[in-house]
């Protein structure tokens, strides 16, 4: 209870963009950590910088506490571990949010305080024992570019460390039959964005040439030799990797094995594989491309009919699914080009494959915000996909509420294809204001109409996928949406049964980076999550409503990072600070 009082005392209320009362950034350090985690969602560079400033201040406060003891040792350790493991959760493409830019920002800020911990985290983006790392080798060149833009220093220690990781893996791959994909992601010399990294890597791979050069002319010749040798090594590695891109460059498209093509390549190159232009017309008359297209069509047909496995879609972003579905729908509605049925079938197959990473959910109802702020920010796309995923996995059946100026109840039973689900949701009111209370009243009115008993009225999870910029609710002075909802529910229960209704478990899933919060870290029977990755829904799989009623946003955050994959981060933190007794 003391934690609740402290959070309330330390966290100001404010009016959000659309008039609803919300909580602002707190002065309480624990609350700040929770709020920071809830704003880790894909955004632009300016907001990433705001998040970097928030993280800097939190780390500064926790570091300062080590000498001033404002928090107990146990409290300080807990917050440091949670904050450090957030790096893993942010980048993890398997079981986390899968965000790269926000992860790079966190590593960079941590480096300012604890360089060793920052480098260890970066290491885990590409190297993990006996399991998939948090990211991929693609991260190294993008991270180097991020640091360069931040520091204007090509020789920054973090860049040096990342390049050393690449070189070490290349050397290992030369001697191994089980190669990593580092060769695929090594920057090319002619790349405008990453060519400068190639020069650094070439010098590191053959330092013996540069070490003996004493004059400028000798250094130029030595570097030329370094680059030539490094090009040969990278070319040889890529040939052994036998990637799709290598076959495309070699003009042997017909030899591509579409059962092995990665989910991202499948997503981005459907039209290329089908040998069609954006307008749906044949792209090339070369036999090689025509055979490739026929092979790909056969692959799609096998997946659609159930004869073959689904087309890989595990790593495709939920926003990309919805964007492609919307394009296909618009093409069919307005006749801007020929809609290729194979493209739709491939997308639906990838969706089915992607769905396998989410387990069965309990009694959960999805509410998807389709207001103008969501469409303008592009957050509408992942929100639609998350809503459909919940509907597919919920015990309550395939149903979704969308809300803008008016709420709409969608029954998706009998609609099997993802693209058709998106088409159905697109019929609702989009692009208007964010009248969340009207959507909430739709549910409450149904409960009142059916005269549900108090234990029935709270017997589900309400998952709200929104940017949290709700319209003003008609409550008392400075009452938040949550407070207004609590009172409405309680009053309805008293009127019907003489005892208050309790709210269902409220899952506020934040879809954009902002500065307002619907609940505090200590509010029971609520969750506050953010991001585009559906794997976070697994936190609610096989969880009884009794268990969820005791959960708070803070306990849910702790649970989200309490995974075996992130244990190495915790152990590193304990080793670094010398507190092995941390539990």
Located regions from the model:
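Long lumenal/extracellular ectodomains of secretory and single-pass membrane proteins
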Residues: 1-382, 392-583
């Amino acid at each position: 209870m003391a934690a609740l009082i402290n959070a309330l005392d330390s966290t100001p209320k404010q009016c959000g963009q659309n008039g609803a009362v919300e909580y602002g950034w707190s002065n309480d350090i624990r609350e700040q950590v929770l709020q920071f985690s809830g704003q880790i969602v894909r955004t632009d560079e300016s907001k990433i910088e705001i998040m970097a400033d928030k993280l800097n201040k939190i780390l500064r406060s926790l570091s300062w506490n080590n000498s001033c003891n404002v928090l107990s040792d146990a409290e300080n350790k807990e917050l440091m571990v949670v904050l450090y493991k957030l790096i893993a959760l942010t980048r993890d493409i398997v079981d986390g949010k899968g965000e790269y830019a926000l992860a790079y920002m966190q590593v960079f800020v941590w480096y300012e305080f604890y360089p060793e911990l920052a480098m260890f985290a970066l290491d885990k983006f590409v190297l993990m024992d006996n399991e998939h790392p948090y990211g991929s080798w693609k991260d190294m060149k993008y991270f180097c570019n991020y640091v360069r833009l931040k520091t204007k220093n090509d020789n920054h220690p973090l860049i040096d460390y990342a390049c050393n990781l690449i070189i070490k893996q290349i050397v290992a791959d030369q001697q191994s039959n089980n190669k990593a994909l580092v060769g695929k992601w090594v920057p090319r010399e002619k790349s405008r964005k990453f060519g400068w990294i190639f020069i650094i890597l070439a010098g590191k791979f053959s330092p013996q040439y540069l070490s003996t050069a004493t004059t400028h002319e000798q250094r130029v010749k030595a570097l030329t030799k370094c680059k030539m040798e490094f090009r040969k090594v990278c070319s040889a590695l890529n040939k052994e990797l036998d990637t799709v891109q290598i076959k495309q460059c070699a003009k042997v498209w017909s030899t591509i094995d579409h059962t092995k093509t990665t989910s991202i390549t499948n997503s981005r190159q459907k039209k290329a594989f089908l040998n069609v232009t954006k307008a749906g017309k044949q792209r090339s008359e070369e036999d090689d491309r025509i055979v490739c297209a026929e092979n790909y069509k056969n692959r799609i047909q096998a997946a659609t009919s159930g004869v073959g496995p689904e087309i890989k879609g595990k790593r495709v972003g939920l926003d990309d699914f919805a964007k492609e579905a919307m394009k296909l729908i618009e093409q069919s509605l307005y006749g801007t080009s020929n809609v290729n049925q194979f493209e739709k079938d491939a997308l639906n197959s990838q969706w089915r494959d992607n769905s396998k990473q989410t387990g069965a959910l309990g009694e959960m109802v999805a509410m998807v915000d389709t207001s103008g702020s969501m469409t303008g920010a592009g957050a509408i796309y992942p929100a639609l996909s998350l809503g459909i995923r919940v509907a597919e996995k919920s015990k309550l059946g395939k149903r979704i509420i969308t809300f803008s100026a008016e709420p709409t109840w969608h029954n998706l039973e009998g609609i099997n294809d993802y693209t058709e689900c998106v088409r159905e949701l697109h019929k609702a009111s989009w692009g208007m204001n964010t009248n969340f209370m009207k959507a909430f009243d739709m549910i409450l009115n149904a409960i009142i109409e059916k005269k549900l008993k108090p234990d029935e009225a709270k017997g589900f999870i309400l998952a709200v996928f929104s940017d949290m910029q709700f319209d003003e609710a008609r409550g008392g002075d400075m009452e938040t949406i949550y407070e207004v909802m609590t009172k409405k529910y309680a009053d309805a229960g008293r009127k019907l049964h003489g005892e208050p209704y309790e709210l269902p478990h409220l899952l506020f899933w934040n879809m954009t980076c902002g500065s307002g919060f619907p609940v505090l870290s200590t509010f029971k029977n609520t969750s506050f999550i953010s991001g585009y990755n559906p794997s976070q829904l697994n936190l609610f799989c096989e969880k009884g409503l009794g268990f969820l009623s005791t959960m708070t946003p803070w306990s849910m955050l702790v649970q989200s990072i309490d995974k075996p994959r992130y244990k190495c981060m915790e152990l590193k933190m304990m080793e670094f600070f010398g507190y092995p007794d941390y539990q």
